[in-house]
Amino acid sequence: MGSTVHLLVIDNRDSFVYNVVELLRSLPELTFEVIPEGELELSSLPEHDGLILSPGPGVPSEFPRMQALIRAEAGVKPILGICLGHQALAEHYGARLVQLPAPRHGHASALVVIDLADSLVGAIPTGSLVGRYHSWAVDEASLPTGLVPTAYCADADEGRVLMAMRHRTEPVWSVQFHPESMISEYGRAYLSAFATAVRAWH
């Protein structure tokens, strides 16, 4: 692979993917290509070192090609899920989704990092603001033993909501918040940490 990382960004029909792309363009020794979820063909995937599953509307079951990609690639190539991608990874491993009491769209929350050793959220100081755009969340109590919670938010009007997790043994990470949002203070650092993790895996 060398030092340059090549990522596939799966576009789940969401305009935020363009913000993800802009952050990726700012990172050194990294190339990428964007594939619309509806055009995914497992038999003809381009060569890649890792995957980013973008945000998107609705729930993971509305994106069957992304779900098939997760089944094929989880544990094989490093994966980062963002928002919808985070929820899809959680469901793949057996966790459940819950609906929030009220949607969070363009909402700023303070991140509480609980796994300082995690190579991705460890790049974000506790208390940093993150941008949230979701009405569903992963039920932290339903996480199987293979998934480790790494960060959460705890706004006064909603209690603790899982914001990040990783797989205990596989190169899988995900976040409910949007690192590419202008609200998120350390989004570039988070994506850079994922690129570093991809290099380390290979």
Describe the residue ranges of each PLM region.
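Generic structural signal for residues in well-ordered beta-strands
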Residues: 32-34, 97, 149
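Short loop/helix-cap segments at secondary-structure boundaries that form the rim of catalytic
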Residues: 25-26, 42-47, 89-92, 140-144
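Histidine-centered divalent metal-coordination motifs
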Residues: 83, 134, 178
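N-terminal beta1-alpha1 cap of cysteine-dependent amidohydrolase-like domains
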Residues: 1-67, 71-75, 84, 185-186, ...
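Cysteine-nucleophile active-site neighborhood
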Residues: 48-123, 129, 191
